[in-house]
Each structure stands twice: as C-alpha cells, then as structure tokens.
A protein has these predicted regions:
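Conserved catalytic core of the tyrosine transesterase superfamily
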Residues: 1-244
Length: 244
C-alpha cells in the first residue's frame, strides 16, 4: 500500500477527543503528573507502585516486558539502560532517566536488600507467605484502576479504564510532541514496521498542521494547477511527516 493511499484512508477516521484520537488512548502530561502523585510513598507498597508506573512511562515497555525484567537487565551506570525482551524474541535497550534510577535504587533497598546489581531475581514480585512469585498482569491492572479512581477526584478526565498500555502510548506521544523523530519513536517502541508508529503522527493534529505549513512554505509560488496532494509520491509524504 502506498503512503499516499494510506493517508487518504486515515483521513476517513472521525476525530474524537484527544485521548481517543486515531484509536490511541493516551494521557496528557498534566494527567500523567496527577496520576503519579497518587501512591503514598511513605509506605513500602506506595514506593513499589510509584516505581512500576514510572517505569511503564519512562521505558514505554509493554506490561509483560516490564514484569519479565530482572535486576541483571538493568545497567547501573552513568548512561543507565534496561534490556527488555520484546515481540519476536528480540531484545532492545531502552535509556532510563536519572530520576528513574533514583527510584529504582530506593526500591531496591526495600525489596531487594543485599542483592547485587547482577542478581537474576525479577525486579517486581509478590510475596506469598515468604515465597516470591512474579507479579501478574492482573495485579498491575487492579493497581492502576485504584490510582485512576483516586486521581479522578482532582482530574475528572482521567480514563475510567486505565490500563498499562496508556503509559506506553502516552510516553510515545509526548516524545513525538516534543520533537523526537518518528523513526526514533518507532525504534524506541520496538515496532517492527514504521507504519505501525504512523498512528502517532495522525493523532497529533497540531503537529501535522505545522508540518504541512512548513512543507508548503517553499512551494507557495507554484500555480494551484501544478500541485495535487493526491499525486504526492511516497518519498515526499515521508519527508512531510518527518520520516526522511
């Protein structure tokens, strides 16, 4: 399928509120800040829950990728990264922000005391009668719903069906809105096909408008009859959307 035809098909999708545009559900940066303020960090559980949400957002990892993360998959260095095993059994290395590393170290002191940075233990786990077990997807979803309900008191727009993928979509959209090239966003998300990531470009209407204005500035002298959007070739469309 050509990009020209692809974008014509996208234009048929009706616009909805921001968090539902083009099938993507994501939080605004303000909503994310309210959500991350909900855990009680004076408690051990609150420290764990906050780290889990921060890592879902900072890494953009899928929930199972994060729950499968082991301590030895974290690079504790001046340029910290986490190694996640994604779809197709492919590893990718994701940069982690210094503030996130501070939360990881704080969490490690409480949940992994005495364990070194190369331990093979799962980073997140549940303790049942002294026996550790990997944390389940269901546990995370229940936890997120709890904090979403709490956040809704001061942020009515908080989704009622908050789920782990909201964090992945939100981080990708925020990076794109702040100027990250869509090709880099695609690599960061671990998408095998760049077209999968194009949905973020379609969802952000304001950035799309600015990109079109910028691309049109140099051709304003061309007669209207010489320019037809339906005949733009794939390479031109890719440059228009920041893919070249």
């Amino acid at each position: 399928i050509s990009l020209a035809r692809y974008y014509k098909e996208l234009e048929k999708i009706p616009w909805k509120r921001e968090t539902e545009s083009a099938g993507i559900e994501f939080l605004s940066e303000a909503e994310m800040k309210v959500l991350l303020a909900q855990p009680d960090t004076a408690t051990k559980k609150g420290i764990r829950d906050l780290l889990l949400m921060i890592m879902l957002y900072d890494t953009g990892a899928r929930i199972q990728e994060l729950l499968n993360l082991r301590i030895c998959d974290i690079q504790f260095s001046k340029s910290p990264t986490v190694k996640v095993l994604g779809k197709g059994s492919k590893y990718r290395f994701i940069p982690v922000m210094p503030k996130t590393m501070e939360h990881i170290r704080k969490y490690m002191k409480l949940y992994h005391p005495g364990e070194g940075n190369y331990a093979n233990a799962f980073l997140f786990y549940t303790d049942r009668k002294g026996v550790r077990a990997p944390m389940s997807d269901d546990n995370v979803r229940k936890m997120l719903r709890h904090y979403a309900d709490s956040a809704r008191a001061s942020c009515p727009s908080m989704p009622t069906n908050l789920h782990p993928h909201h964090f992945r979509h939100s981080r990708a959209m925020h990076l794109y809105q702040h100027g990250m090239d869509l090709a880099l966003v695609s690599q960061w998300l671990g998408h095998a096909n760049l077209e999968t990531t194009l949905i973020y470009a379609h969802a952000d209407t304001e950035m799309k408008r600015k990109a079109i204005e910028k691309a049109s500035a140099g051709i304003c002298e061309i007669d209207a009859g010489e320019s037809n959007p339906d005949t733009l070739d794939d390479d031109t469309l890719k440059r228009l959307y920041g893919l070249r």
